[in-house]
Swiss-Prot record:
The lineage of its organism: Bacteria, Pseudomonadati, Pseudomonadota, Betaproteobacteria, Burkholderiales. Keywords: Cell inner membrane, Cell membrane, Membrane, NAD, Quinone, Translocase, Transport, Ubiquinone. This is NADH-quinone oxidoreductase subunit D. GO terms for cellular component: plasma membrane. It comes from Cupriavidus metallidurans (strain ATCC 43123 / DSM 2839 / NBRC 102507 / CH34) (Ralstonia metallidurans). Belongs to the complex I 49 kDa subunit family.
Amino acid sequence: MADIKNYTLNFGPQHPAAHGVLRLVLELDGEVIQRADPHIGLLHRATEKLAEQKTWIQSVPYMDRLDYVSMMVNEHAYVMAIERLLGLEVPIRAQYIRVMFDEITRLLNHLMWIGSHALDVGAMAVFLYAFREREDMFDMYEAVSGARMHAAYYRPGGVYRDLPDTMPQYRASKVHNEKAIKVMNEARSGSLLDFIEDFTNRFPTYVDEYETLLTDNRIWKQRLVDIGVVTPERALQMGFTGPMLRGSGIEWDLRKKQPYEVYDKMDFDIPVGTAGDCYSRYLVRVEEMRQSNRIIKQCIDWLRRNPGPVITENHKVAPPSRVDMKSNMEELIHHFKLFTEGIHVPAGEAYAAVEHPKGEFGIYAISDGANKPYRLKIRAPGFVHLAALDEMARGHMIADAVTIIGTQDIVFGEIDR
């Protein structure tokens, strides 16, 4: 009698649930996965090599394009590595602004995750809800940097500029008349901090809406509970970080365990899962959204009370103000040297890691004393998680592979780099 061979199926790279350009070669016994082999590299853009040909400051926009859903957090790790090499002190106001925008970015990421994860599993409404909130947060990005996504707002020594006192206003168009525009601009009459505060007051009710739609939903639980289970020991052995590790019951968060910037002054909790399955990771991320909202509120209160500089006064690292540059020859020279030659970073090496929405995102920078990095290594959290896909998917159905890819929160910009 002939042997029955396993069936090989190509999943992706142009599959709607593949989260970008994932190609999975699945070995199937009927509908059960025997082996899942991820093929990566389809979004490789040689970021680490490109950084070696650019000055230290010119590489900041490349960081936005790594995990293109969590833009400012990527920048944060990079500028922290430069600051460690330079031994720079960042003004306290800039630290609070960075922490606030890190958490806004965490919300952006988790909303994208919950929307696309639910859409993959078959719940479309949450996707539309999540993008309604993301629109407000893109406006926050736009107010400080001029860009909705790729902000390039963090700079070595601080941030590009202080928070604006006014918000961009909508104008009447063919789509929206004067009456509609008046309603849309209601929350935009004050400063950016007023706009963010208004959003943080509304946001908990939005999270309640997502939970109403999903948390006790029978179909959602059937698709997530006991799928992709990872034990705490295995999660550590495979190098998991972030919600993937906390979902397995290990309380590890760089914001608490190795605090950077002003996280040690913040009051927040670390949500931890119990079962290590997709449902536990879902609950962890939903609670993380609530905790991020708490941190943003604390930052708003502090920033209202404490004006001050937002970037270092050292003009060999940060450009002088435009007013000074146009009236003072020395400042003009500083400006010219900074944007032509860049910063000469002392020889040495530094590793800076941040608690990225997906896990531990690290930048290992080596300087040989020149104005460009000698070597830049990017530690992407998603790379480790994708490597565990085979183990997590084995023995499950094809439909469950989609759920597992969703729970890993994979973005290929950072994996392929």
